[in-house]
């Protein structure tokens, strides 16, 4: 199968063609993956009588779900660029060791997170801002979802190693299997069997299990470089790889964890300044953001293995061209989407809820939140380049800068100190986009480009 299957050749062909060849299947995969969350929210919002309340309650669970995904990406997102760099250097034994180390860490952390989450789900949800009425829906959803932690982490954390070998279509299929299953199972468990919010969680973990099974089937049998769990005598040898994986993956890990931190802070402030209705508004905004960011993530992830491979192969011209193509694609797309958000916000909001009261508050909030969204591109591009080229310190620093040092303080400063109420919560995002995104991108230009020039000498 792997010999006959079409692969993206990261070393040859046009850079634009390679990026599109990797990014388009990833875009389909990202869109399908988005369906896991989007479809869930659409169905939850339409549960008779309790839809809006249940939507807000499940929104409170998102930070914990993001934390689980963050750990999967810590090992997968940290290991895959190192895997690609080793392949570019023609060091395939090292590449396999990196992949096996990542897989072992994904599995061990998955079990630990599941047990911890099940034991402390209720106090965690209360910490995240769940009221007594919200716990009625949030707690059963989270308890069921946590049972699928391990397959969820395998599906997310090991998929990058499929893409890093050039099998982007296979990577897409691994996501498609779960997404299609979720589309079928959601209405069955929610409405036909009458499980309500519990049905959403059951459908999700069953779908994620199917995706994980496909990923393991391919990586253990069909891929060129195969994965397995580390043996006892390999653990000491893998320690160095583990440190490099974690240090490089820490940037994406911090970004996702700080996204959860921001969501927690926003929910806490909104519950005081606006009530439960504004937590539902933030859930809608988060859903819209996931929707419009999906192609951006696909382009970034499609470009990343090409950057890593050619950097390892010492081909600076292809690295530089990849950065330029990445920038053009993302900026054009974001410009179109930003205009759509500002001009027709109602269309995007109606995808998730038709509640008129919610619509009234969500429209101005959405415009405020996305006011400077195009500057976020600068952050994404800089972060992708830093991570792909194994620039750990820069990747980690800029992950912390925008969220921890800018957004979180502003989330409290603007509503309480500047007396801006709920508006302050939503406006904290564009302010951070302008400051954090600009600094990140300028730093990338001033550090990476000179290094590539020296590599040519």
Q: What are these model-predicted stretches?
A:
Residues 31, 35-56, 125-132, 188-195, ...:
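Helix-terminus/linker motif at the lipid-water interface of multi-pass membrane proteins
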Residues 1-23, 83-148, 194-249, 307-372, ...:
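Short alpha-helical transmembrane segments in multi-pass integral membrane proteins
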Residues 27, 31, 35, 39, ...:
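Generic alpha-helical transmembrane segments of integral inner-membrane proteins
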Residues 10-50, 63-78, 82, 107-114, ...:
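N-terminal transmembrane alpha-helices
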Residues 21-40, 144, 178, 207-211, ...:
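Transmembrane helical elements of multi-pass membrane transporters/channels
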Residues 55-115, 152-171, 267, 281-339, ...:
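Small-residue-rich hydrophobic transmembrane alpha-helices
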Residues 21, 44-66, 133-137, 197-198, ...:
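Interfacial/gating helices of multi-pass transporter permease domains
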